[in-house]
Amino acid sequence: MIDKGIFLIKVFVCLIGVLASCYVTGAFLSCWLKLKDRFGRSLLFGFVFQISLFECVALPFMLRKGSFSAMITCYLAVFCFVLVLSFVMLLLLKKRGIYQSSLVCIREELQERRQKKWFGVTFFGAAFLVLVLGHIAGVTLHQITMGDDVYYVSLATYAIDHNSLETNTMFISSGILSLPDIRPNISAWEYYVACLSVVFHLHPAQMFHFVLPLFLIPFSYLSYYYVIKKLFDKKYHMAYMMWFVILNLFFSFSAKLNSYNMFNCPWMGKVVLYNILMPCFLAVCIDIMKAEKETLKYWICVVFLMIAGICTTVVGVYMIPIYYAVIGITYAVTIRSMKEFKKLIVPVLVTVIPAVIGLLLVLQTEAGQRILEYSKTEPKRWTAVFLNYWGIDAKPVLGVAGLVLFFVSCVVIFRKENRITKTVLCGLTIFCALTIVNPLFIGPVSSYLTGADLYWRMFILVPVVYVLPYLPAKLCFKAGTLHHYEIVIGFMLVVSVGGTLLGGGAFSDKKIFAPYETTYGIPEKCVQVTDYIMKKEKNSDHEPVVLYPPALRQGLRQYTTKLTTMMSRMYYQGDYETPYGTMREVCRGVFKKQYTEEQAYQVLKGLNVDYVVTRRYVKFRNPQYFTKCKRYGRFVIYHVN
């Protein structure tokens, strides 16, 4: 077992290393682009720069199926050069008085607030920080291994175990099912995490499940704060963020809503895209809207964000440009002169080039060839999608209450806020919602290509998270002067939080609050069983084939890809045809005792299975067929003779 003290030291070193490198590169980027160095923005932009740089370095290796070691060696060489250059340049600029560290700015701002005795800001800020820490603690301490981890975490594990950049979904998930790939993968996010694992000597499963949330969750709130600062008066910022994190945590318990993934799997690339990169993207676009001249620096940031979006998930190839288009269309409607509109056309076309190149590369992959077929899939009715997202179909009264609150908030924003804020919060909401009516957009994401409509659900709800905290934040500063309609709105907010935002029923799921059994984020028995088989077969040239029960199978390939499994996730492989029926039927026969012992032996032997792990109520007694090896709790390991 792992020494927890050593593990925590590694985690601490990893956090310091990641945050320091992000800050140094981000501060230099801000200085180079003539942006004022702010600590939070420097961290975010440094992170964006790192993953966009990694995508540029990794993509040629991925397309040629090169070696993982060569890829990370190349990246680390380039990145170390950039990091050292950034650090040296910052020291030189500081010596000349050109650069001022954001830490100095933070100290000055704290002194200013102390002099003003701005109790509201400090109170809401403290509440916000406590809630964020609670969010981080909840994610890092609770145990949940999602089905998607079987692929995403295993991809990083496989790269390290086999020094390979193989991305075939079926093969990575099991090691045996070499079926046509269903994911046109040109995104390097999992390899970026694998690179961090190698550098800081941590297992990829530990990096994904335990370490990444420690800085990705703060990055998420920083990116939203970056947007809020540009939309509202300074005194509302902390109150807004306090309510935002409260609503965000409530959102997390409904699988129908965007923030569910920020609680259950913040390490996934698609969650990084929607909760970190998209808010940053919106903030930069707001800067462009407000800037009358010298906008080149912001367009450069757009290019970095475009590449970073492609790095996190392949759907970034089309979701970021669509989000870009929605923001652009929303702003174009409010533009008062054609001259201002024409100034934007060329920069927009130039900055979208990385996404165009990415889309062309996707179409050249084997899985990408199926996009046209999948896009012909009949999409879901937009009315069904809309009603489902708001929970109106399950809880009509509460769902309608939440929807009314949302629209009333939009009306108040439209009446009381400035042009840019109206454009972003009201216009963006409308145009995002309208995209689901367009079958050209909803078709591909309602199909098998990207896993139902998950990505579109997240996309449509992006503006919602900005609108809902608006009224509560305003009400915090209007105590004693409330109008009747504001009291009603506050009541509706309570109803919405109590009902719609908890509509997924996740509070009844005990797994959500179960503590981690291991630092890998997978069941302890899975680690013990796998270690036993690996130790027993360490001198064998043959890679063992195993069959695990449902409770353990999802953790196996995350922990090691040096074992082959007949089944890792039913969703991927349940319908796979074998000489003995589908894999679903085989598993049912073995684990639900629908086979006799002799039949189970013949099937497993025919599938070349070396070990089968069962629950203790499934017993194989005939030593001619099975040899009992070891028992761990309620799981028993049998060798197939």
Regions found by a protein language model. Name each.
Residues M1-W118, G358-W382, I436, S446-S447:
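Membrane-embedded, hydrophobic transmembrane alpha-helices
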Residues L8-V13, L63-T73, I144-T145, A255-L273, ...:
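Membrane-helix boundary/interfacial segments in multi-pass membrane proteins
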Residues M62, Y298-G316:
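Membrane-interface alpha helices of multi-pass inner-membrane proteins
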Residues L131-F251, A255-W267, V272, I276:
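Active-site lumenal/periplasmic loops and adjacent helix-entry segments of GT-C-fold
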Residues K235-A239, T295, R336-I345, S409-A433, ...:
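Membrane-interface helix-loop-helix junctions at transmembrane boundaries of multi-pass membrane enzymes
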Residues M319-T351:
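Perimembrane helix-loop-helix junctions
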Residues L349-I353, L475-G505:
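Signature aromatic-anchored transmembrane alpha helix within multi-pass, membrane-resident enzymes
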Residues P523-E585, V603-F620:
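Short periplasmic/luminal acceptor-recognition loop of GT-C membrane glycosyltransferases, typified by
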